[in-house]
Amino acid sequence: MTFALAYPHIDPIALQIGPIAIRWYALAYIAGLMLGWRYVKFLVARPPNAMTELEVDDFLVWATMGVVLGGRLGYVLFYKPLYYLENPLEIPMVWQGGMSFHGGALGVIVGIIAFSRFRGRNLFQVGDVICCAVPIGLFFGRIANFVNGELFGRVAPDVDWAMVFPGGGPLPRHPSQLYEAGLEGAVLFLVLFGLWRLTGIRHRAGALSGVFLAGYGLARIASEFFRQPDAHLGFLWGGATMGQLLSIPQVLVGLALLAWALRRGAKAA
């Protein structure tokens, strides 16, 4: 290795007010939810009008609960079940870190189903507009991972933009958090927005949800090739990581949903 970028070493605490510490991680979740909320309001103001703007305000509560509860429980069950079985009192301690996208996604899906039934809305139309906004939260979440110096990449001695992360040893590594912010966040957001602008796509309820599920799964599978596996899990079947194994069924479900939506055609208003 001849060169490595300097890791910026940003304090994970954005603001300290007496005993109260506000972390970048928390601000990332807040920014993702708030900007996603505004973006969904923009989307529902246009056909097929999945819900009203007031209902978007209501759904924000459902989404927040789904993300936090699902994300935390997903991490507990998928990544450290034995640890939390021995330390159950630490399960609610989300400020210590440890959230799972796949768990958060399941939590939001449950929220979408419950909200749609309660409000009498089309499940797939609601899902489509929510899925269009999710990459915003993913982008900020991955940036927060980078600020915290966590979920760093694999050793990359021959990559000029590699960084030496605190807690990652002396060797430079891929800044895989930024790769994920780009793929799962920015690129997926632009793809979904571009497809949403096509009337023939956004009126086919479920199509955008399918694109999101498959698109995120593919982006996650690709980025995992550069990301260091969780130390307590390592590589699993066939050299795959837990993130890849959880993403494979997501891709299949997304492709099936997309195919179903395209065959079903535009639903009458």
UniProtKB/Swiss-Prot annotation:
Location relative to the cell: Cell inner membrane
Keyword Cell membrane assigned: yes
UniProt keyword Membrane present: yes
Binding residue positions for a 1,2-diacyl-sn-glycero-3-phospho-(1'-sn-glycerol): 142
Gene Ontology MF terms: phosphatidylglycerol-prolipoprotein diacylglyceryl transferase activity
InterPro entries (alphabetical): Lgt (IPR001640)
TM helices/strands, residue ranges: 17-37, 59-79, 95-115, 123-143, 181-201, 206-226, 242-262
Domain of life: Bacteria
Family recorded in the similarity comment: Belongs to the Lgt family.
Descriptive protein name: Phosphatidylglycerol--prolipoprotein diacylglyceryl transferase
Organism (species): Paramagnetospirillum magneticum (strain ATCC 700264 / AMB-1)
Gene name per UniProt: lgt
